[in-house]
Amino acid sequence: MKLIIVLVMMLVCVYSMSIEKNIPKNHEVPAKKQFAETKVEKKKRSDDGDEEICDDDDEDCEDVVDIEECNEDDDDCVDGGETEECDEDDDDCQEEKKKKKRETKPKLKKRNDDEEEEECEEDDEDCEVEVDIEECDEEDDDCYDEDKKKKKENKLKKESKKKNSKKTVPKNAKKSSKRSTSTKKTSQKKQQDKRGAIQKNLKIKEANFKKKFNLNF
């Protein structure tokens, strides 16, 4: 009887141990799994309508703010906001719109000035010196004068560049012709020296031959 009781106790112990192995404890759950569960809970909460608030220690969580970036050509668009449309009768709105347009233009100009300007070499005919030409309003007379001045400067620079390129071409041609004539002269002189040396050697050989055999011609 005691033996049966001991066997039953052993079976109960083994069964309880197997149950404990199959059921993991909370602290034994991997950290990634817990993090994934919290993310799912947060997503579910945001889907329900609640805004997601990030903890200070949570590096992966970010408060996302959608910022609309504007193109350079879109004058009506302002960075960080939607395009503002004004009514025709609303003068204040139109003035505000013009003010924003004036503020954005210097920013774009500064960005362009920060870029490196390409400098042309004297021999490079394809390269052209560019001058920035600002677009003028119809009512601004001073701007028109400045615009014409810049265009004139650009034209003069292009013409002077073309003249310089034309001058350099004949100079290079003269140099090449001088080089060719000098090379021809040197080659002719070398040939003459070579012939003279050959004739001299022949005369010396002939004199030695006569001395050897005491021949008189």
From Swiss-Prot:
Keywords: Developmental protein, Repeat, Signal. Residues 24-58, 72-205 are annotated as: Disordered. Induction: By PKC. Residues 48-58, 72-94, 114-145 have a biased composition (Acidic residues). It comes from the Eukaryota. Sequence repeats lie at residues 32-81, 98-147. Residues 1-16 form the signal peptide. Residues 98-110, 149-188 have a biased composition (Basic residues). Expressed in tentacle-specific epithelial cells (battery cells) as well as in a small fraction of ectodermal epithelial cells in the gastric region subjacent to the tentacles (the tentacle formation region). The later cells are committed to become battery cells. Residues 32-147 are annotated as: 2 X 50 AA approximate repeats. Residues 24-47 have a biased composition (Basic and acidic residues). Responds to early signals of head formation in hydra. This is KS1 protein. It comes from Hydra vulgaris (Hydra). The gene is KS1.
